[in-house]
A protein has these predicted regions:
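N-terminal beta1-alpha1 cap of cysteine-dependent amidohydrolase-like domains
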Residues: 1-242
Length: 242
């Protein structure tokens, strides 16, 4: 059973601060009963059609279409006194339908040190998905903790991937696993995308295993490294602690 009291209380608090909403948007997981709209309209002092239902959707980009079905844009324009034409959502609707009906699939391993918190790589996640939208492909992201990759098991853990992405990060934790991921991609001819730190570990891997510079490393991880293939720019290291 849906409760209206929390919404009523929130609106009352706003009104107590001098803010009287013209429109109330109700977030919900399931369709609301008509009585809910009537209660919110009555007790929150908003017009009946200004109580808008915003149901949880499986796909975020359907939200504008759903809100338009609720006449949200015309109601907003009316409340603001704006005379505007109806939005043209034809191309958006086509985009949503094409995304929902993608035919291709690809498996990308995202190898990082913060994978327990996916939001740490939110921009990378969304970029991969958008690339898939443009190419009619579902991108399946496999979150792989670089600290969990070892010489004994990295091949097994990275098998079955179509590509590997190593994103940015700081510090030496998990670097060994990232280097193994770069090595696996190179030796198995897999597409490899290194962003910032990810590109640095690719350079280190190549230097060690192809160029024969066995002690190659980054000055960020080992200040005393005799063969720094990555290092801070002059003056940059002085600002690291800051």
């Amino acid at each position: 059973e849906h409760k209206t009291k929390p919404t009523q209380h929130s609106v009352k608090e706003l009104q107590g601060m001098g803010v009287s909403p013209n429109i109330v948007v109700l977030r919900c997981d399931e369709p609301l009963e008509e009585s809910i709209f009537k209660k919110i309209s009555m007790f929150c002092n908003v017009k009946p059609d200004c109580v808008i239902e915003n149901i949880t959707l499986p796909f975020l980009y359907e939200a504008p279409l759903m809100l338009e079905r609720e006449n949200f844009s015309s109601i907003v324009c009316r409340e603001l006194g704006i005379d505007a034409p109806a939005p043209e959502l034809g191309e958006w609707r086509q985009m949503v339908e094409s995304i929902k009906n993608r035919t291709g699939e690809v498996n990308i391993g995202l190898v990082g040190k913060y994978v327990q918190l996916h939001d740490a790589y939110l921009s990378v996640n969304e970029a991969l998905n958008h690339a898939g939208y443009a190419l009619n492909t579902c991108v399946h992201i496999h979150w792989i903790d670089s600290e969990g990759l070892t010489e004994a098991d990295y091949k097994e853990k990275l098998s079955g991937l179509d590509g590997i992405l190593v994103p940015g990060g700081f510090g030496g934790r998990g670097i060994a696993g990232m280097i193994l991921a770069a090595r696996y991609a190179r030796e198995n001819d897999l597409p490899y995308f290194g962003i910032c730190l990810g590109m640095q570990v690719a350079v280190i891997e190549y230097a060690r295993n192809v160029a024969g510079i066995t002690k190659a490393d980054s000055g960020e991880f080992d200040e005393l490294c005799p063969d720094k293939v990555i290092d801070f720019m002059p003056g940059q290291s002085e600002n690291i602690d800051k």
